[in-house]
Amino acid sequence: MLSNENLNSEEIIRELCACNGLSFEKIRQDGPATTTLEMFFSGYPKMAGLSYFPNLTQLILVGQNIHCIAGLESCHFLKELWITECHLSKIQGLHHCADLQKLYLYHNEISVIEGLENLLKLEVLWLNNNQINVIEGLDMMQNLKELNLANNLIHSIGESLDPNVQLERLNLSGNKISSFKELTNLARLPSLMDLGLKDPQYSPNPVCLLCNYAIHVLYHIPQLQRLDTYDVSEKQIKNLAESTVVKKIMYYNMRMKNNQRQQREELEKVRERTSKAKQVPENRIRALSFLVKNLEHELTDMKSSGNMQANIPISNKFHENNCDTEESNSQQSSERRKNNSDRLEQIHKKICALKERMIFWTRKLSEVEKHHEEKCRRMKDSFHLLDQFLQTELETVGNVRFEEGTAADSWFKSCYDLIVSRFCAMNFRAYGISGIKIHRIVRVHNRILRLKFEDKVQYWMDNEDLYTTESYKKKLEYLFYIFDPKLPIDKKELLHVLENGCNITRSSQLPEQEQVEAVLLTNSMSLCEGPRLEFLQKQAMNKSCDPEAFKDGIIVIAKVFLGRSVKARDDLPIKPNNYAKVNSVYRLQKFANSTFNSLNDEICSSKEHGNCDCSLRQCEWLVFDHEFILPEYVVEFEYISMEKSSGFVTPSNENAEDVSHDLKLDEDAIALEPFLKPKPKIISLDEKTVLSVARANIYSQITVLNLHGNSLSKLKDISRLNGLRKLIISFNEFSSLEDVSYLTNLEYLDASHNQVITLEGFKGLGKLKYLDLSWNKLTNSREDLHILRKHAIQLSSLDIRYNFWQKPASVLKDTIAILPSLTHLNGVTITEDEISEALQISSGSRITQASLLINARTDTVKPRCLNLLPSAQILAQFSKNCLDPNAELSNSWYTKITSLTLDSQNLVRITNLEKLVNLRWASFSSNHLTKIEGLEHCVNLEELNLDDNSISKLEGLSKLTKLRRLSINNNLLAGFDRHVIESLSHLHFLSAENNNISSLAGLQRGYKLIELYLSNNCISSNQEIYSLKGLNNLVILDMWGNPILLKHENYRLFVIFHLSAIKALDGVAVEPSECENAKDMFGGRLTSDMIAERIGHQRFTELQDLNWRTSSIRSIDLVPADHFRNVQTVNLENNNLTSFSGLIFLPNIKNLYLNHNRIESILPQQKSQSHLTNRQILHQKVSSSGYGQQGTSKGSRDTVYGEALSPVMQSLEVLHLGYNGINSLPMLQLGRLRNLKSLYLQGNEISHVEGLENLQFLRELVLDHNRIKAIAETSFAKLNSLVSLNLEENRLRDLNNLPPLLKLRKLLIGSNKIQEISEIEKLEVIPALVELSISGNPISRKPFLRNLLVVRLQNLQILDGILITAEDRARAEMYFMEQQSLTVPNAVMDLGNPVSTMIVSKPLPLRVTNFPLAGGAHHSLGADLHFNNGHEDIFQNEANKYKKLKNYTVGVGHNPQNTQDIALRQLRGGTHFPASYLTQQSGQARSQQKHPFNQENEGRCV
């Protein structure tokens, strides 16, 4: 046999030599010189003959049938080894190859990585295409640079690669990695540059099929250059991954804040219920305590009056129950002694009875508080679970998502009905449970498990040809997952189940027949919860379990594919090997180990089932493959207990009968004799009153003073009682104890049941030994305790119960630590253990070198992990870069510290950090800090957490210019220091929730802020939002729980409008529709807040002018209007107003400028058109339709715009409404402005002048640049005060209906369409006219017009902007005299009636010709002016018309007025002017009336 093996080895070696070009015969000579051997595809079944090649450096064996590695003992210089596709099953025999650098073992059957411990120089290792399940055995390979483990069976990475810090290339494609958490382990490989998880040559890992896979990898491994063979070295790609993750962290942080807010709201509800439950005990304690102190006061009076012996023991506290009496004064008579003794005994007996009742109610109160604390604890645990859900969502980048259901969700109702149907009250009767109340249902969306579930089911169905879709559905079931009943449901276990799937129960410690290797589920609530309740009930009997633990529970509902299922056999353990080709087994309820199985028959026949499905089979299911189970719902519930059921009665469940019985016992105790008469209350103290109460003659005699039960709030001159040793001031109204200061002999002070809020001013009580401060309103425990430590150094007994402490949990320990002289606290003796514990806590209240070594970390890079905790806390939990407390430390060890976490260390001050110059992340939450100090040298600090302290100011942060994140929740901040925020130029995250902040003024320069959390503060004014308008980077704002939300109805839209960059407000994303609604509501809205923002204060009464030109204002809301009572001028030109809006409420406004707006009316008009005629509607649609408002019926106008409308803005005198597009004056309702004096309406589209009848005081009216065609009868009829009227640039053809405006002095009608000279006559009805403009009309082309008007209108002083001088007037009169001499000789008429020849009915045309006129009599008319011959027959038809004119004389032609008439009639015929004359006239400048905004014209009346 041995010879055969040698023969085979020889043949193998010969084949080896042949394949490598070597001679077998010369192998001994040539072998040492050979460095490389190669064997491909058979011919080398085992590793033989390698000893002939001691200097071999490369060995390549491919496609052989080698099962083990051997024969390398002499290959000490081997550097590269290939054994691939060789059926190799184990790694061995490499320990002699210490110089090996490259090892290729791919395509084999290796299942374990082993035998590589000595390969310290190995740089390349390929183990792909094997059967490896676990990454292991690589710890010693610190030089490894390339590792290929593709196409194996690896499920997890863990910490197995942490030692391989030089690893640059890693290929894990084709494995079973399904969790993002596993990939985060690769972030600890600092040199990793090339990673493969779904290499195209292999199938992808399940994790690669999840959303955001690449984003997750690139964020955690930023140095990566290639991912899955793709180049990812571009900075843009890394930035995209970074920004995506940052946004997700912001999003989940916001949701975490939402959870915390909901938690606070729920806790507040619990506190309200607790407060209600405490009312009865507290009221009873107060009433009973008041009576006890009255009786004790009576005892003191009896003693002081000499009616009883001295040294009678008086009990002053609840725990003192000494009811013995002493004998009466021997000096009194026996009868007197007996009466006094009886009364004394009655008083003591009643005091004892009342104190017993006080003890009872105190115990009740403690039970309520204990129940409250337990309820709060369980509620916090519930919300903490939601926080963990969010953390899981973030870590899985949304591939595991939790959706909290509401009644509106269809799945919520289905799940709810399922739970109710699977709950049978009969099954829970033994535990005192009558029902179930569901608090929360959370739906689990696990994309990872769902993919596994679907793949597994699909694979099963592919191998089961007989199964159809319908049969598949029948195999699906929703079942309850059963946790270990002996352990409470741990959050980690619950999260593990929801994220990674259900665990297979392995009960190997049980007897063989009871062993289970499967996932345990059930379709019954009783089978799911029964074992847990039984276990808790047993513990409750032993008093080792809180009865409240019964009430709350959590269940997981999973979708289960049962596959092939059979009934469990009694004789076989439930293991996969015992049930071949079976996916699940079930066992009916009778097999379950439950104490209530005997009730089964009763259950099935009971009528108390309600809607439960207990008639169905209740059984347990055991599923062998956990991938057939998909957790879908998490349900939090509470059991409803039966009345008076043991283990479930809580203080809040007590019925009215019990309370009535307890109250009756109180009344019985109160009814005991003696009955004390009520004493008159003392409201203020004076010397007489003090002496009377103390029953003394002088102050020096007073040692005891009892002022119990009065209405005192001050103790005037109490310091004069130098001998006072005991003072009782309970049941008064003191808010401070400053008045009792410097009572140097005072030993006993009872100030219970008052309103004391602080001990500030409490001084000079060096002998005080007893102090009762219970039932007050103290809040700051440490501050008040330090006052007592300083000013009451001998204090031995202190009662501080029932105050409003900010941190009640630490009050007792702080009190014992701060006041070392105390022996009794809250009526209980302080034990040595309590003193020791308090001193231990106190000793740790300073930052020492030891605490720094324990809590510091030295990481140089911020942790790249998806976690919502502060960076310092993340490093404290996960980082291993700690300082060694046992090592010898040099002076430079301080500079290595980059992270420090000192949470819950009872710190009072931040000290000893001067040397931490490289500190970047720090957390000091849950301490007793009152100010920020000691951080001045930590200039590199980037994150700072100061939550849960007592800090009131941000002082001490100014030098932290690199600070990026600041959290200061649950403190006492009242605002922000502008200089501090300005110095924090890189701050982008600020959380200051649960403080006392009322102003945001200091945040105006926090330009880099992205996230701002300010919930539960005291912000109440909208104006505070303006302080944030400059924060253009602000994306998330949370102000929930501030008064501003309740005070302002449209708060949300208001904030969205003013902070345009915001994406989420109060935990809710801002929708595009909300942005539109905000613009509609607040766009262009002038409010008090806007004005305050501009002027910098809210002293609106100082304002006289408001100038908001060109501000895009659409509405005005200045409330309260009385604050603007001194405003007289408002300029809102160039805005978007459609009405006067809120301006009508300004009481004293005089000048209003609204040019260039869109004013439609004084008040907003209704949109309805029901009152309009068809013509009016058509005109509104098409302004050129020509119908205008002429179709408006008189009745309709009177109804809508008539005089019945009440006056508004009665102080307004000047109104500018130019260029508003106004087409209807009645719609403006200007008649309501009764005291208006100047009205400017230029540049509109007005075609009819109406609706001004009520403006009786109007003096100036401007209507130029409109579309007025005619003057109606009523246009100016009642404007009797009108002084100036401007109608220029309109379409007037005549001046009909122009009323006799007696006061009108200025009329501008230029640039209209007036053609007829006859229209000039109509101006004569205006007697006071001083200024007239008529240029730009067709009539103005007539050359005689100016002379005519000058002569005709004798009072006229300015015409077309040119002053009329005396010379002008004389020239005009001369002209008409000459005109008369010209026209009279040419007239064909009778001398007896000369005037008739000058009266014509037809126009006498004048024409310009080139024919010169002989003579010079008419030089003033121009050399080229001639009359047409057409005048010869102008009198033929007029003779009869004027026959009645008989009384004229021959000299009538010399009358100036008649001369003007003659000239006027001649001008009616028309005149043609020569070009030279027109040129001359056009050269004359005519001033045009303009109407710009001018403060000088505000109250002008011409």
From Swiss-Prot:
InterPro entries: Leu-rich_rpt, Leu-rich_rpt_4, Leu-rich_rpt_typical-subtyp, LRR_dom_sf, SDS22/Internalin_LRR. Residues 1479-1496 have a biased composition (Polar residues). GO terms for cellular component: cytoplasm. Residues 317-342, 1479-1502 are annotated as: Disordered. It comes from the Eukaryota. LRR repeats lie at residues 53-79, 97-119, 120-141, 142-164, 166-188, 224-247, 296-320, 699-721, 722-744, 746-764, 765-790, 792-814, 822-849, 894-916, 917-938, 939-960, 961-983, 985-1009, 1011-1030, 1031-1053, 1100-1123, 1124-1146, 1147-1170, 1209-1232, 1234-1255, 1256-1278, 1280-1301, 1302-1325, 1327-1351. It holds the Pfam family LRR_4. The keyword Repeat applies. This is Leucine-rich repeat-containing protein 9. It comes from Xenopus tropicalis.
